[in-house]
């Protein structure tokens, strides 16, 4: 029997980066807000206390704060003709499952998207014409420009205490910053990180080629900081253990260090943990949401009525809930019709590893996004004529903290196991670093998300199925980027070089990034998008879908800052426009 609860005004499904912002901003209206989170509550002072915060087995290898794949996972295949199989262990990406979501174990890379990223299709056609379009490309403009969202980027940066140096301040290029970034209305709230030895070597070589290195924006505090919500964070001490871990020093911005504790001050807000939402419930004509159904910690089915439902969980869960709820037309890649599940994209990654006899880097000292980058090859910052691809990559020397299990690098030709491998691992731990080529990914017809016809979760519901492989565009992009990285690496002058290109076929096994996007793309046309520019469902106007699921394709830059900015943007649209007169906003 389903338990029916008293109605509330607004339900937010997922209390991570996006959901926490939406709960906080909407709680100020005085309406009854309920945040539903399927994971457990985290107490950073307990769960991430030293020395336990540096337990790599617990957090990285055993996935303590990540999604429980024994209860729900996804299935994967490269092509439509193949049978998809379940992902049984964390591999290519790491969705979170706790209050704060993936925002608890992220690496604190806090880059904005480029203006080009929001208008990929129109700008590509304007500059290069139709002959430059990738094969089977489904990429599209967002329906939202960089200029429209700039103030919300600024708002989120000041909530998360991002450190950096402006490169384009109100149209004036600033020394020390990224000259290719979109215009900023003001400086970062925190100063840029200090450059490491590896970063200095990279910067010197890049400058000799006429490139413009800068320090990557970071949400690991470069100085003590109190944010817009009066939450105070300490300064990063470069202790490493950022990716896959919480921060023992309370220096990494996350939903639990910047937003969620302030929600306790709002008596009209309630957080419910261990609530696994299984569908959005619709009225008899399917045009209005009347609430959600979830499974609680005791296995009971609960219906929570609400006037407004906001899906703010991870890309996969947002898309799956839309499919399970019958909101929007599922995408059919054969007919190239439908929208839900369309435009799934990822990011490309490649690197050049450098090994030295005469240089020591102490890589155990590092911090979130402690990185020196160049954007000369990012987005459309260079002429793509004749290259055979669109988009680009940023090149970076990263000093994020080399953990003892995951961060073992050995020179090419080293045996994969045994005494010689051990000797090489010990000898080279302190004497290597890599130049990474972080590339974008265009959406295309054969890459999509749908419901698996065979496999089900612990509640008997179909798993999400991913069909994905690299396209020719991504292969060419990554090959170009790794050649540019190799040029810089050779100037640095290592004793040995190891080139690690993009795999010919995408594999879900090795970790790459937790930057999965699309499936509920935003846009100006209901025929090619799930949500409008305010992230409001075209089909069910009292449902908003906020997160990286809204990206129509992926930038080379990490998505978290854009997810946060979109949450701030949507919160304002709901407060200022929708609540006064509930209706389609576009």
Task: Give, region by region, the residue ranges found by the protein language model.
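FAD cofactor-binding and catalytic pocket of flavoenzymes
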Residues: 78-113, 117-126, 133, 142-146, ...
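Conserved redox-cofactor binding core of oxidoreductases
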Residues: 59-77, 84-92, 97, 109, ...
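A short, basic/flexible loop-to-alpha-helix module at the beginning of a structural domain
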Residues: 1-7
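Residue-level detector of alpha-helix initiation sites
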Residues: 12, 16-17, 193, 197, ...
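A conserved FAD-binding loop/helix module that cradles the flavin
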Residues: 553-571
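A glycine-rich dinucleotide-binding beta-alpha-beta segment and adjacent secondary-structure elements
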Residues: 216-222, 238-242, 278-283, 430-441, ...
